[in-house]
Structures are given as C-alpha cells and as structure tokens.
C-alpha cells in the first residue's frame, strides 16, 4: 500500500512538473487578455508572432519596422535555469524575416522571409523557409521549402501539424477569397500542392495567420471584414466534427478581440494558454484629470500604445465553449 501511494505521488509530481512551463518568469495567464512579458518582449515597439518550443526552453518573436518595411526574428533561450537576453535569432538579421513556428517535435523552425533563393532569383516576395536543430543546440542554415509550396506570390505564417501537414497564408489562383488559409499535405515524405482550407474557414474576404492544433482538431485564424468583426480583424476558431470536417468558424469574442487588429495566434503545447498579437490602444485617454508630459510620454512609448504587442490569456476553459 505504501509503495502504491509513493508511485501515485511520484506520478502526480511528474505530471505537475510536465505541465509547468516557465514563461519568462511571468507566472500563468489569467482569464483576461493582458500584455505578455512587458519590458522583455512587449516593450512599446512593434512586437508580434510569438512561439515557444515544445520543451519550453526557447522563444521566438518578431520585431518589425513601421509600415512593414522590414522585420527581424528575435530569440530568447532558457539555459541553466535562467532566460538569456533577447537576441537576434541566429538565422535572421540580414533579410526581412518573420513568423517563426516550431515543428511539433521541436527539431525545425519554419518561418517566412524575403531572402533570395539563389543569385538568379529576381522575384521580391516572401517564401517559407526552415532551419533544423544542430548537434550543438543551435540552428542550421535556412532551407527553402521548395516551389511546390512556395509560389511567385507571398506565403506567410506557417503552422505545422504532427502529421507534417503545413498550413499557411497566401493569395493563390485556386483560393476562395482575397487572402486565404492553405494546406499542403505531407505525403510520402513530400509536400503536395497547396489547397485552400474549407469554406467553413475561408470566405470571399480576408483570412490569414492561422494556427493549427498539432492534432488538427481546431484552427485559429484572423478574419477581416466579416459581419461580426469587432474591429480591424478578429480571431476566429473552427473545430472539426466527427467526420473530420471543419465546422463554421466562430468569433472568439470580446474576451480576446478588440477594436484593433488581433492576429498571429499561438496556443501553448499543453493547450492551456493562447498568445496573440494585437495593436489595440489601452493607454489612450480620456483621463480623469489633465495628464502630465511625463505620463503622456511614458504611455506613448509603452506597451498598449497602439503598436503591436504580444498578449496572453488562459485558454483551456475558453476552448471548451466553442
């Protein structure tokens, strides 16, 4: 009996530890969407598209110039129990790179970049690339995903399922609307040609920046211009039914969406926390009394100033409501 109690207790401890992720020493998300890692990631600049490794020891996000002039992927790593300083990712810094996402096994990072495929490349578009983890715990050289996946047009926001299927944003001739979510099936070790995701997700308008559940049971994305749009683009969810078909997408609601643009969703690997980008302005007046110059300058240069920040919210219970 004592041995049984010991085993049960050990299993509980192991399960608890497995569920605990150190999100930059920020504690846990709450039922209200709040700025994530203020002063570390969200710092008053344009910070967007967050991802964390399956082991919870690496974070990537993007810093972007205004008007999408250029963007750079940033990197933070947990070593010896401590997070290091924010640095430019080892595979970024020269070109306009953004939207890094881990493969479910943590061995690859997929991202979008306008770097040229070779010296003969004359098309200035964004393609999808990947890097692989090296033996010394770094990242290798970027590899182009090839022209079955990539086109002469832009491809953005890769999201990879356990099956290997690749979801991304593009404007292709076989699309449904003005911008759509596409999927490339991974079959026999190769990516197949992109096909648009169901019209339960895609519309005649704009759908972009989709996160697919690694098990492909739900998908989150931004829709713009829909009848129930609360602002300049809202986050939506679609789940699969028992037949494996995507159901009609639903707006995630006012707990998450705002009057601004809400986009770039990422759900933690334990499916408890949603991270997303938003350019909502939470610092603007009106004020209860005249504001001082010092307070005004602080607000204008802090997260929530209308530039893009990373937000997070407790998601597991919310997910059950859809």
Which positions does each model-derived feature cover?
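Short, conserved micro-motifs composed of acidic
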Residues: 19-322
């Amino acid at each position: 009996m004592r041995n049984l109690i010991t085993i049960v207790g050990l299993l509980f401890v192991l399960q608890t530890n497995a569920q605990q992720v150190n999100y930059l020493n920020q504690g846990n998300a709450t039922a209200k969407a709040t700025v994530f890692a203020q002063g570390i990631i969200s710092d008053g600049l344009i910070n967007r598209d967050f991802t964390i490794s399956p082991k919870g020891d690496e974070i990537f996000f993007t810093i972007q110039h205004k008007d999408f002039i250029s963007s750079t992927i940033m990197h933070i790593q947990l070593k010896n129990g401590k997070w290091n300083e924010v640095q430019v990712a080892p595979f970024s810094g020269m070109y306009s790179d953004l939207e890094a996402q881990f493969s479910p096994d943590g061995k690859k990072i997929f991202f979008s970049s306008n770097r040229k495929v070779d010296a003969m490349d004359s098309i200035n578009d964004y393609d999808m690339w990947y890097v692989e983890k090296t033996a010394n715990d770094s990242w290798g050289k970027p590899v182009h995903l090839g022209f079955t996946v990539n086109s002469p047009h832009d491809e953005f926001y890769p999201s990879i399922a356990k099956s290997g299927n690749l979801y991304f944003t593009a404007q292709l001739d076989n699309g449904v609307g003005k911008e759509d979510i596409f999927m490339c099936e991974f079959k026999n070790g190769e990516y197949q040609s992109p096909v648009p995701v169901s019209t339960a997700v895609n519309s005649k308008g704009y759908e972009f920046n989709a996160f697919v559940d690694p098990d492909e049971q739900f998908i989150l994305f931004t829709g713009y211009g829909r009848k129930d749009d609360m602002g300049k683009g809202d986050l939506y969810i679609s789940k699969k039914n028992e037949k494996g078909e995507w159901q009609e997408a639903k707006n995630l609601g006012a707990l998450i969406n705002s009057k601004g643009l809400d986009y770039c969703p990422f759900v933690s690997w334990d499916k408890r926390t949603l991270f997303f980008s938003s350019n909502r302005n939470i610092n603007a007046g009106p004020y209860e009394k005249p504001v001082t110059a010092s307070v005004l300058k602080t607000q204008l240069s802090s997260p929530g100033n209308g530039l893009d920040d990373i937000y997070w919210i407790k998601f597991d219970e919310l997910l059950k409501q859809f």
